[in-house]
């Protein structure tokens, strides 16, 4: 039976993962599965020690994924989620104190001093601003040439495309008509690393995969 999680960027969402993992190693049992990758992609940062099950699971999934991508990583941070709000709020008093340092109590601030203060403020904002690298969930239709196309081999060709930042998810065969079926498949991407258009043009509909795949259409595209 499918498990439903929501708002995994919030403490409440992570709590639901924590409770689900009680007595389990991974989302769907004792082995890593596509379910773990999908949930991992939706959790922006490692859960705190307040959620020991979720924290241990997150580290385990990260370790398994690292083995699949042996290239040297420089580290990526994800910004813009509600989970990051406390850290930003914690910095606010310090910023206010810095603002006080720039005040001229006697009203004698010159244009040069004012410009210098503005430059310092801009530099502080640039330092605090995290570099964002968002994730997206994509639903795609993959169409065969005809009813004689081996759909098992077609799906193997699709899932055989591997690259950093690309995570294949659940799939199903959907009847189109005249005995033809299409493959509907979900996948998650790191936006800075993978372009759906390039994935389709350079890998899925080019040789050798075009032996089975006629065309691909993006059905849904949602930011995580």
Curated annotation (Swiss-Prot):
Pfam short name (any one): EF1_GNE
Stretches with biased composition (Basic and acidic residues): 112-134
Residue list for modification N-acetylalanine: 2
Keywords recorded for this protein, A-Z: Acetylation, Elongation factor, Protein biosynthesis
InterPro entries documented for this protein: eEF-1beta-like_sf, EF1B_bsu/dsu, EF1B_bsu/dsu_GNE, Glutathione-S-Trfase_C_sf, Transl_elong_EF1B/ribsomal_bS6, Transl_elong_EF1B_B/D_CS
Molecular function in Gene Ontology: translation elongation factor activity
Sequence ranges assigned to domain GST C-terminal in this UniProt record: 14-65
Regions of compositional bias (Acidic residues) in chain numbering: 97-111
Oligomer and partners: EF-1 is composed of 4 subunits: alpha, beta (1B-alpha=beta'), delta (1B-beta), and gamma (1B-gamma).
Family to which the UniProt record says this protein belongs: Belongs to the EF-1-beta/EF-1-delta family.
Functional note: EF-1-beta and EF-1-delta stimulate the exchange of GDP bound to EF-1-alpha to GTP.
Name recorded for this polypeptide: Elongation factor 1-beta 2
């Amino acid at each position: 039976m499918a498990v439903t999680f929501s708002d995994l960027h919030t403490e409440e969402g992570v709590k639901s993962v924590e409770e689900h993992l009680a007595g389990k190693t991974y989302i769907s049992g004792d082995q890593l599965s596509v379910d773990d990758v999908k949930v991992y992609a939706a959790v922006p940062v490692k859960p705190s020690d307040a959620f020991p099950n979720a924290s241990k699971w997150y580290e385990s999934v990260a370790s398994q994924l690292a083995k699949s991508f042996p290239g040297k990583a420089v580290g990526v941070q994800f910004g813009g989620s509600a989970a990051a709000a406390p850290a930003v709020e914690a910095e606010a008093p310090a910023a206010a104190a810095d603002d006080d340092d720039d005040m001229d109590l006697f009203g004698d601030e010159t244009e040069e001093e004012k410009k210098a203060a503005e430059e310092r403020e801009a530099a502080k904002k640039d330092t605090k601003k995290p570099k964002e690298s968002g994730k997206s969930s994509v639903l795609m239709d993959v169409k065969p040439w005809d009813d004689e196309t081996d759909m098992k081999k077609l799906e193997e060709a699709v899932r055989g495309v591997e690259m950093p930042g690309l995570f294949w998810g659940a799939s199903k065969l959907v009847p189109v008509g005249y005995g033809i079926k299409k493959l509907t498949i979900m996948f998650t991407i790191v936006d800075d690393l993978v372009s759906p258009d390039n994935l389709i043009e350079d890998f899925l509909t080019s040789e050798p995969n075009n032996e089975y795949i006629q065309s691909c259409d993006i059905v849904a595209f949602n930011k995580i």
